[in-house]
């Protein structure tokens, strides 16, 4: 039986509340609508069945309450946030409140005029994502024949408007062997920051894990090449910064996910559900909604946000582990996805009794034969089919 510990009588009583910090980082998932179909999207599988999006006024109320509580950084995400017609207005209101604002976008739907409007509204930062350095592979993964050309044009336009060029490439077994070409493209575009983020397995990426997880050999090679480029760029005095993010499937200790559950990070989904991380929606927990509760109540008093705070909730082997203050027991969403119980130790940890699942995934990556065309693409049709079971 799947469990987060939230549906049993024993779980109704929480341990004493640990000290709670401020929700410094607010992620506003403005919409699940998106013109692309990336098979590694972190959105929930049943996104097509989610409720009505928050209105402009409701989002502004969220921003105001979060800012009053100490939130400092606000990310606009999705889906594709550009499909919201009120995006410039939301950026402007966030600016008035004093947020540092970041637009996380595919670049599809972006125009020179919108960049100008966002600049006037006070947007601080734009990150554009690519699927690959090769036009054919990029467009195949995105599910759009025009995606690559649009991304190139908008990356240059963002820089021309005075923004630093920040690019994100999600890497996986189908594009990681071209890491050198990806970096060369970024250099040619005069990128300032490049995130080479190996696929993290949540949402659609978890559904497609066997077809996306790189082999260890692929990862080692990609990281070596990235380090070689770093050294070369530094020697040349080049300002481009390369950030290489590995999947924890090849680690022996889990990541300190979100710096701890309900520690500094707060996500609000398109329908107003508030989450301690953007992957938590899959858990069978009744998370609070901003339509019904204040941000103050959600952050400090709601069951969902307090469930895995601190250390008292931990079973063994986490409870007695001398590393628990470093990794907080790892990722609760990953523990739930793989074991059915979010209170279990993250299976990535070699101390977890479920670590064999990770070892099996590594073995499967060595023999996987999935093509890009065989992946389940993130679109409304597939989402509705999944929701129906």
From Swiss-Prot:
Q: What keywords is this UniProt entry annotated with?
A: 4Fe-4S, Iron, Iron-sulfur, Metal-binding, Oxidoreductase, PQQ biosynthesis, S-adenosyl-L-methionine
Q: Which GO terms describe its molecular function?
A: 4 iron, 4 sulfur cluster binding; cyclase activity; iron ion binding; oxidoreductase activity; S-adenosyl-L-methionine binding
Q: What does the subunit section of this Swiss-Prot or TrEMBL entry state? A: Interacts with PqqD. The interaction is necessary for activity of PqqE.
- Can you name this protein? PqqA peptide cyclase
Q: Which family does it belong to?
A: Belongs to the radical SAM superfamily. PqqE family.
What's the source species for this entry?
Answer: Pseudomonas fluorescens (strain ATCC BAA-477 / NRRL B-23932 / Pf-5)
Q: How is the cofactor bound?
A: Binds 1 [4Fe-4S] cluster. The cluster is coordinated with 3 cysteines and an exchangeable S-adenosyl-L-methionine.
Q: Does the keyword Nucleus apply?
A: no
Q: What does this protein do?
A: Catalyzes the cross-linking of a glutamate residue and a tyrosine residue in the PqqA protein as part of the biosynthesis of pyrroloquinoline quinone (PQQ).
Q: Name one Pfam family in it.
A: SPASM
Gene3D superfamilies named among the record's database cross-references: Aldolase class I
Q: What is its EC number?
A: 1.21.98.4
SMART domains recorded: Elp3
Residue span(s) of domain Radical SAM core: 20-235
Matching entries from InterPro entries are given as: 4Fe4S-binding_SPASM_dom (IPR023885), Aldolase_TIM (IPR013785), Elp3/MiaA/NifB-like_rSAM (IPR006638), MoaA_NifB_PqqE_Fe-S-bd_CS (IPR000385), PQQ_synth_PqqE_bac (IPR011843), PqqE-like (IPR017200), Radical_SAM_PqqE_MftC-like (IPR050377), rSAM (IPR007197)
* HAMAP family found in the cross-reference section: PqqE
**Phosphoprotein in keyword set:** no
Sequence positions that bind [4Fe-4S] cluster: 34, 38, 41
Pathway involvement? Cofactor biosynthesis; pyrroloquinoline quinone biosynthesis
Catalyzed chemical reaction(s): [PQQ precursor protein] + S-adenosyl-L-methionine = E-Y cross-linked-[PQQ precursor protein] + 5'-deoxyadenosine + L-methionine + H(+)
Give GO terms for biological process. Answer: pyrroloquinoline quinone biosynthetic process
- Cofactor(s) in the UniProt record: [4Fe-4S] cluster
Report the top EC class in one word. Answer: oxidoreductase
């Amino acid at each position: 039986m799947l469990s987060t510990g939230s549906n049993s009588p024993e779980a109704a009583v929480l341990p004493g509340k640990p000290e709670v910090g401020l929700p410094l980082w607010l992620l506003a998932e403005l919409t699940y609508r998106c013109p692309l179909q990336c098979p590694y999207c972190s959105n929930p599988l049943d996104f097509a069945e989610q409720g009505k999006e928050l209105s402009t006024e409701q989002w502004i109320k969220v921003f105001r309450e979060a800012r009053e509580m100490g939130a400092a950084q606000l990310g606009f995400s999705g889906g594709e946030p550009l499909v919201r017609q009120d995006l410039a207005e939301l950026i402007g209101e966030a600016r008035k409140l004093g947020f540092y604002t970041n637009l996380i976008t595919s670049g599809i739907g972006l125009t020179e005029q919108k960049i100008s409007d966002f600049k006037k509204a006070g947007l601080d930062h734009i990150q554009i994502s690519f699927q690959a350095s090769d036009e054919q592979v990029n467009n195949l993964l995105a599910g759009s024949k025009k995606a690559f050309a649009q991304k190139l044009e908008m990356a240059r336009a963002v820089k021309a408007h005075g923004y630093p060029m920040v690019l994100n490439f999600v890497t996986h077994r189908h594009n990681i062997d071209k890491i050198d070409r990806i970096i060369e493209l970024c250099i040619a575009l005069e990128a300032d920051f490049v995130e080479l983020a190996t696929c993290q397995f949540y949402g659609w990426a978890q559904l497609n894990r066997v077809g996306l997880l790189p082999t260890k050999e692929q990862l080692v090679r990609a990281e070596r090449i990235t380090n070689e480029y770093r050294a070369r760029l530094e020697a040349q005095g080049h300002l481009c910064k390369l950030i290489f993010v590995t999947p924890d499937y090849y680690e022996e200790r889990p990541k300190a996910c979100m710096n701890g559950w309900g520690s500094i990070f707060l996500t609000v989904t398109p329908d107003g559900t508030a989450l301690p991380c953007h992957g938590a929606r899959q858990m069978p927990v009744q998370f609070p909604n901003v339509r019904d509760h204040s941000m103050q109540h959600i952050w400090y008093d709601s069951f969902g946000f307090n469930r895995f705070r601190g250390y008292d909730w931990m079973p063994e082997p986490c409870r007695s582990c001398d590393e628990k203050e470093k990794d907080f027991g790892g990722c609760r969403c990953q523990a739930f996805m793989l074991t059915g119980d979010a209170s279990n130790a993250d299976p990535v940890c070699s101390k977890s009794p479920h670590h064999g699942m990770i070892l099996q995934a590594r073995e499967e990556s060595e023999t996987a034969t999935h093509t890009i065309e065989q992946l389940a693409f993130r679109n409304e049709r597939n989402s509705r089919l999944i929701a129906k079971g």
